[in-house]
């Protein structure tokens, strides 16, 4: 039966048997008991599936990963301890010293740092391109050693909608996968695999948890990218892994090869696994994701329209606005809505922007987005503080930009708070 995604939010990933709990149980355990040392050996050889140590896998984590996988329409998925870990694993799983990445310049500041500084120090180079680049400019960014293309479905905080098909076509012409962070719209509003994206990541900390209570991340593989067709580019997947007695992931695990390698190698070596209690809580919160996203988007639409009509605001960026530069792309890829985050400009310089934030009462200042409580931030002074003026411009983050995450409160109360804060900085 083909069920609606709202139903998958509730029912996905877990089907209880007769007499079993209707809600997924929590397996808060580090290790698992076996009666046979031979069976344990098979687990370590990857010749048999099962659990032996939560640093690699845990039943609770896998249940929630399966739910997200179903929602995205993927072939395999895994959870990580944070969205940052998810993006790192997604790239490092196929990139090594001497390799190259093409990435959209309009991405979260922490991810920009990960790619531009940390991974560069590991010998992995990156060419950043504007999400608005022409096909010719995008083609020029590729090198013979390019292994992946990365972007965000809706960029944080500039709210630029990525043209999936343009980036996917370029990636596939060069025999590499397109990896997209789908945190902001969630699979409720956007299913990137339907438009040629190969791998999706999430900061589940955001809308999926939705209550500011659990840090986490997820990686979902569509199973559509043919690693063996480009075997020379991806030896980690297409040649024997010495650390697992010569297993070749692409031939042994098929559509699950990418996630199996990330679990067996990267989780083993980096240990970025979420605590089962965090996954369990997040899984419970995901049951209301469809309902919450509808409210987040409705609130953001109403607030964005109000801001757009207010002369005290210099500009508003929200893909749901008809006049927004990315409205047509949003209608194409996210016809049911975008997200609950708005960016807008408060004129007068950094001090004026900071003063506006300081005058807010209900809307809190927080390094967060996408939970039940409305919050705001000044990205140029916080999340993107490490970027140069030129890099800020490339990322679409001006010095007047305010990021507002609309919660699920009454939209009129959000507007009233913004109104009084704008009035205060005019005095």
Question: Which ranges hold each PLM region?
Answer:
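Glycine-centered tight turns that cap/initiate beta-strands
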Residues: 73, 145, 312-315, 362, ...
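Conserved PLP-enzyme active-site core in the AAT-like
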Residues: 6-15, 77-310
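N-terminal "arm"/small-domain region of PLP-dependent enzymes with the aminotransferase-like
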Residues: 1-58, 66
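Conserved N-terminal alpha-helix of the aminotransferase class I/II PLP-enzyme fold
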Residues: 36-88, 110-118
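Short, solvent-exposed beta-strand edge segments and adjacent coil->beta transition regions
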Residues: 48, 337-341, 399-403
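Conserved small-domain helix->loop->beta segment predominantly found in fold-type I
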Residues: 270-273, 277-279, 284-288, 293-295, ...
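PLP-dependent enzyme catalytic core of the Aspartate aminotransferase-like
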Residues: 116-117, 125-126, 140, 144-147, ...
